[in-house]
Regions:
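Bacterial N-terminal signal peptides that target proteins for export
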Residues: 4-9, 14-30
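C-terminal motif of bacterial Sec signal peptides marking the signal peptidase cleavage site
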Residues: 39-42
Length: 369
């Protein structure tokens, strides 16, 4: 996955000026909102004509941050009900988000990876043609264990050889970490991680497993010559019990690590940071997941976090514009999200995100993979 570093804003105004303007921007006339609601109802067919709350679905990694912003919105705006935020996983959330326009469909998709081109095409096919992409911060895929664990230093190749269903095109036979690398522990491989619907799982495959697989030039060559075979060999996860799908509940993984110090868990960095009294991060290529190593991208598992907003819902769903504005007020270095554990994006990325959050610039599907 390519992490985006957006250019600084130009003549349109400084970052702080744009952010300040968000809180003083006039509210559109009620008649415009009513017209938008009527249009949205028409899109939604026979479904209910209104909804009291903004509805967001998607990533379990983004969930605690989205909840924090939702609570702040309700606190700052007594007339706006708190948005409903659901943890469905990024992939499942994309399906819900892209299912259509109308009050029966979500307004926002929280994502721990960028939208895929195939998902964008599904959206367009179902009438969701105008989508606003906003990068809200950074995160890292953390590999963690209980504080009393052996403390291994892993590489992407180690992790790939331990978790791949067909490492380097051969059947998986590794039972212990020592089978993977003689320098590692002889403890059995037991990894609790995200399900296939999770953006964290997608990032694990793209940032770690694929990188480990491509250490073999023959496997790397398959990426262009035989994509299905490449994916089968490089990104499919073993299903023999060594990797345990733990659902979209990252707190459950933390509990499992406490109960079994020999196991490893995979989840977003914020869960590692908020449970530092119980678990510790493992080094990947000699680098511990920290705020600093994710912020400067030296940690191999660093990744961006996004929200996707359905532009057709902006005027019709009460509080949606304000919710987006609350995100923008919260993602700075001294903001609510940093205090909640999110890694703040570089200034240039924040500036581009602010433009998207104020101008509601729509996503160009040609930029997606």
């Amino acid at each position: 996955m390519k992490l985006s570093h957006a250019p600084h804003m130009g003549a349109s105004g400084s970052f702080r000026e744009r952010l300040s303007a968000m809180s003083t921007k006039p509210i559109l006339l009620a008649s415009a909102a009513l017209l938008a609601t009527a249009a949205l109802t028409a899109c939604g067919g026979q479904q209910t004509a209104s909804r009291d709350n903004v509805r967001a679905v998607g990533s379990s990694t983004v969930l605690p941050f989205a909840k924090a912003v939702a609570e702040q919105l309700a606190k700052s705006n007594p007339g706006i009900p708190a948005p409903i935020v659901e943890s469905t996983g990024t992939g499942a959330g994309m399906k819900l988000f892209c299912a259509g326009v109308g009050v029966q469909h979500p307004d926002i998709e929280n994502a721990s990876r960028r939208m895929k081109k195939s998902e964008f095409e599904d959206c367009v096919k179902n009438g969701v043609k105008d989508i606003v992409e906003i990068q809200v911060g950074l995160d890292g895929i953390a590999f963690a264990e209980a504080n009393g664990g052996p403390g291994m230093d892993l590489t992407p190749t180690d992790i790939y050889k331990a978790l791949a269903k067909n490492p380097f095109g051969k059947p998986q036979t590794a039972k212990t970490w020592k089978d993977v690398n003689p320098a590692l522990s002889d403890e059995p491989i037991l990894v609790y991680g995200p399900p296939s619907t999770s953006g964290t799982r997608d990032a694990l495959k793209e940032l770690i497993l694929a990188k480990g697989c491509e250490s073999d030039p023959a496997m790397k060559a398959l990426k262009d010559s035989d994509k299905p075979k490449y994916e089968a060999n490089c990104t499919e996860v073993r299903e023999d019990g060594a990797y345990v799908d733990s659902g979209e509940n990252d707190n459950l993984i933390v509990q499992k690590l406490e109960a079994n110090p020999k196991a490893i868990g995979v989840f977003g960095f914020s869960y590692l940071e908020s449970n530092a009294d119980k678990i510790k991060g493992l080094k990947v290529s000699g680098i511990v997941p920290t705020y600093a190593s994710i912020s400067d991208f030296s940690y191999p598992g660093a990744r961006p976090l996004y929200i996707y907003v359905k532009k057709a819902h902006l005027e019709a769903i009460k509080g949606l514009k304000e919710f987006v504005a609350e995100w923008a007020k919260s993602w700075g270095k001294d903001g609510l999200l940093a205090k909640a554990g999110m890694v703040v994006a570089p200034d240039a990325v924040q500036a581009t995100s602010l433009t998207a959050a104020t101008d509601f610039t729509t996503l160009d599907g040609a930029s997606l993979k």
